[in-house]
UniProtKB/Swiss-Prot annotation:
GO biological process annotation, one example: positive regulation of translation
HAMAP family given in the database record: GUFP (MF_03138), LepA (MF_00071)
Protein name as annotated: Translation factor GUF1 homolog, chloroplastic
Enzyme Commission (EC) number: 3.6.5.-
Length: 605
């Protein structure tokens, strides 16, 4: 199969918020162009993981090639490059968009513009994509196309007057969308004579064939059997097989400029074929790589421990397998007095963390305990060195540190105007700094805050949803590090520090968090034969304390009357025994106490 002339290729992606109908629209387009036969159709055909189909989100990217005969009688190839919609995967989104020339902005005509839509549209504009609007779910009773068109123009500054009214479910407007793709999306430049440069926008591990890299040819031509080289990682390999996705793989001999395909060449690890890297020929390499490549850096860390310590090796093996497919996941062994042995894992964000945990439990049948998520702090020492830490136990003593910096992010919440007050209160409680408020329409508002990432990763999303009755949506982007007055809050149980319960928090919030911690532990730790003091302390200074009173055995029960000195002797002996027990007694803290403490959200009382 010869490669197609570039003027007949259209590369596009679909931008949408979760639940606005992106996957259903993709399914309908695949059926409309007869790329997928109706009998082979599964819902959300491009979402290959069960987890994606259940949650209705796109995690891993997929792409599909459709053949379409337009109204001008010409055959066009439409490459749909799917993008994940969630902020945790924004780097993957940006690389997918870099492989396109155009984008469909899909907005639910009953809901309107949401936070993630805004973020992804800005990414598309940064990549100079031609954007046109599709108002989906037009068949619903609550559909308000005129209001939503106005909102798109006001919020995003895009002309929505010629937006296509469609319903992917009811098959309305699909031909209009296909025609608009051909007319509006620019064809790729014809650069067949230049040295090969292909942009990897996805890669995954196939247990039988090694790493499969999905790419778009930017310049030059790729042929089966060519010796290839990755420009960022330097890995070299032979192109054993190249092909196109319909969405299943179909091998071809060569791919020209603008075409989208996959390559298999015995690559052993996804780390050698990273998203954003450039493929070129070993013999005739390109002078420079395509711009925009960066290594994904974990922003959120948490400890993952097996409930059964015998399954530690299974957990390690499962994490290694997931890492083959997901090089943004990092992990290292961690020993913990309460949980035993496990791993300290790094994730791109909270959704990434939830997905990894759920995949470990579901695909590898593991029972896991996950500790509270934390972020990476930069600790500057007095001797001029800098440590990046994510575990409170690694924080050096106050006399050795000059300052601590924590990551901040720009948070954008979009919500009905009725909930603005309560959402602003939540953001201020979480140390947010108000930046801007915009009325998107009479009923919907966008509120922007600069807020520490540590506050966002601890239950912020749940609190926002409960305060707005589920109507608010949010998006955040890391803006950099700032100096903060942070302290390490230790918990002492019977004078012994309980390391797993230590947290890094802001000094102003330390008292309320300490108070919540000690009160919660008092409820959960079983009573002993001696009094157990529970304290929250910063360094040597106790800021909150409580105690669990001792259980008392009635040692005088057998003395019926008789001499009082006998009772005194027994009570004295009991007191001495308790004193000795307090000195040598160990307090066993149950695991559910640790888990319950993880739910302390630290919102100021």
């Amino acid at each position: 199969m010869a490669s197609l002339p570039a003027r007949r290729i259209r590369n596009f992606s679909i931008i949408a918020h979760i639940d606005h109908g992106k996957s259903t629209l993709a399914d309908t387009l695949l059926m409309r162009t007869k790329t997928v036969k109706e009998r082979d159709m599964v819902k959300q055909v491009l979402d290959s993981m069960d987890l994606e189909r259940e949650r209705g989100i796109t995690i891993k990217l997929n792409s599909a090639r459709m053949d379409y005969v337009a109204s001008d009688g010409e055959l066009y190839v439409l490459n749909l490059i799917d993008t994940p919609g969630h902020v945790d995967f924004s780097y993957e989104v940006s690389r997918s968009l870099a492989a396109c020339e155009g984008a469909l902005l899909v907005v639910d005509s009953s809901q309107g513009v949401e936070a993630q839509t805004v973020a992804n549209v800005y990414l598309a504009l940064e990549n100079d994509l031609e954007i046109f609007t599709v108002l989906n779910k037009i068949d619903l009773a609550g559909s308000e196309p005129d209001r939503v068109k106005q909102e798109i123009e006001d919020v995003l500054g895009l002309d929505a007057s010629d937006a296509i009214l469609a319903s992917a479910k009811a098959n309305i407007g699909m031909d209009d969308i296909l025609e608009r793709i051909v007319q509006v999306v620019p064809p790729p430049r014809d650069t067949a004579n230049e040295p090969l440069r292909a942009l990897i926008f996805d890669s995954y591990f196939d247990p039988y064939r090694g790493v499969v890299a999905v790419f778009r040819v930017m310049d030059g031509t790729m042929k089966t059997g060519d010796a290839m080289k990755m420009m960022a990682t330097g890995a070299t390999f032979a192109a054993d097989e190249i092909g196109i996705m319909r969405p299943d793989k179909v091998p071809v001999k060569e791919l020209g400029p603008g075409e989208v395909g996959y390559i298999i060449g015995g690559i052993k690890s996804v780390a050698d074929a990273r998203v954003g890297d450039t493929i070129t020929l070993s013999k005739n390499p390109a002078a420079e790589a395509l711009p925009g490549y960066s290594k994904s850096v974990p922003m959120v860390f948490a400890g993952i421990f097996p409930t059964d310590t015998d399954r530690y090796d299974d957990l390690r093996e499962s994490l290694q397998r997931l890492q083959i497919n997901d090089c943004s996941l990092s992990f290292e062994p961690e020993q913990n007095s309460a949980m035993g042995t496990g791993f300290r894992c790094g994730f791109l964000g909270l959704l990434h963390m939830e997905i990894i945990q759920e995949r470990l439990e579901r695909e590898y049948d593991l029972d896991l305990i996950t500790t509270a998520p934390s972020v990476v702090y930069n600790v500057y020492r007095t001797d001029g060195t800098m440590d990046s830490i994510s575990n409170p136990a690694d924080l050096c003593p106050p006399e050795l540190r000059e300052r601590i910096e924590e990551p901040y992010c720009r948070l954008d919440m979009i919500a009905p105007s009725d909930y603005v007050g309560t959402l602003m209160e939540l953001a201020s409680q979480r140390r947010g700094e108000f930046i801007d408020m915009t009325y998107l329409s009479e009923t919907r508002t966008s509120i922007k805050y600069d807020i520490p990432l540590a506050e966002v990763v601890t239950n912020y999303f749940d609190d926002m949803k409960s305060r707005s009755r589920g109507y608010a949506s949010m998006e955040y982007a890391i803006t950099g590090y700032r100096q903060s007055d942070l302290v390490r809050l230790d918990v002492l149980i019977n004078q012994e520090p309980a390391d797993p319960l230590a947290v890094i928090t802001h000094r102003d919030r330390a008292y309320s968090i300490g108070r919540q911690l000690v009160d919660k532990l008092k409820e959960l730790i079983p009573r002993q034969m001696f009094r157990i003091p529970i304290q929250a302390a910063i360094g040597n200074k106790v800021i909150a304390a409580t105690s669990i009173s001792a259980m008392r055995k009635d040692v005088t029960a057998k003395c019926y009357g008789g001499d009082i000195s006998r009772k005194k002797k027994l009570l004295k002996k009991q007191a001495a025994g308790k004193k000795r027990m307090k000195q040598f007694g160990k307090v066993e803290v149950p695991q559910d106490a640790f888990l319950a403490v993880l739910s302390v959200d630290g919102a100021a009382d």
